[in-house]
UniProtKB/Swiss-Prot annotation:
This is Phosphatidylserine decarboxylase proenzyme. Heterodimer of a large membrane-associated beta subunit and a small pyruvoyl-containing alpha subunit. GO terms for biological process: phosphatidylethanolamine biosynthetic process. Belongs to the phosphatidylserine decarboxylase family. PSD-B subfamily. Prokaryotic type I sub-subfamily. Is synthesized initially as an inactive proenzyme. Formation of the active enzyme involves a self-maturation process in which the active site pyruvoyl group is generated from an internal serine residue via an autocatalytic post-translational modification. Two non-identical subunits are generated from the proenzyme in this reaction, and the pyruvate is formed at the N-terminus of the alpha chain, which is derived from the carboxyl end of the proenzyme. Catalyzes the formation of phosphatidylethanolamine (PtdEtn) from phosphatidylserine (PtdSer). The record marks 246-247 as: Cleavage (non-hydrolytic). One of its GO terms (molecular function) is phosphatidylserine decarboxylase activity.
Amino acid sequence: MSLTTALTYALPHRLLSSMARSLAYSDDPRVSRWLIDTVTRKFNVNLDEAANPDPRSYATFNQFFTRALKPGARVADADPRSLVMPADGRISQLGKIEAGRIFQAKGQSFTAAELLGSDEDAKPYNDGLYATVYLSPRDYHRVHMPWTGTLRETVHVPGRLFSVGPAAVNGVPRLFARNERLVCHFDTSFGPMVSVMVGALLVSGVETVWSGEEIPHYGDRITRKDYRGQGIRLERFAEMARFNYGSTVIVLLPPGVADFAPQLGAESPVQLGQALAKLR
């Protein structure tokens, strides 16, 4: 085990994330301005794309971090059969779910059942596709719908808060199946679809457009919320959630319905709205 990986295990994840939350929501201008200036400078954040490009106009760091984009900054792929990329960021991995397993890095993998919280939830995705998108601190931090879907259920799976940066992904086995996460099940025109919002070190929260804040969740049991019959329908490319700091979203598709865009591969930089896959 490398020193970096050992430190990843040793860090007080919950304490650090709680502290990050307090700072992110602080309306003390000395705190918010210092954080905004530091992150903008260190990660070369492009505020020209923001609906509000003035960094001094944000009352808190969290407002800055979850900023909206100006109209037209991102557009959905023109092909109406394209599933679109759910976020800005970088492809961590993508491919076929083989023998129920999802590849993570360097020969490491985890099962779809571990990720989703049950064998039953994973069955529709056997031999299907997965795409893991990492959002760095410089990226736009709202997550959108790859395809039009009606929300059926969410599943909160408690867990750790390991970093999801490259060093941790390469060094911590089954990382995405161990971190706290929110699994969002949708019914679509081609069948079921899942978007998994993975929590991480320093992520102070995950919010959805239908329920508000979902993470942090202070229970230690898997929690399910049934949304059937509520008619929560989100269109392709519509916002569905946001991270209150950088993290990862994983999309699962059932077998035989789509093929990934050929230019995509591990480490590909991606933008919200570009083609993720095309329906067959």
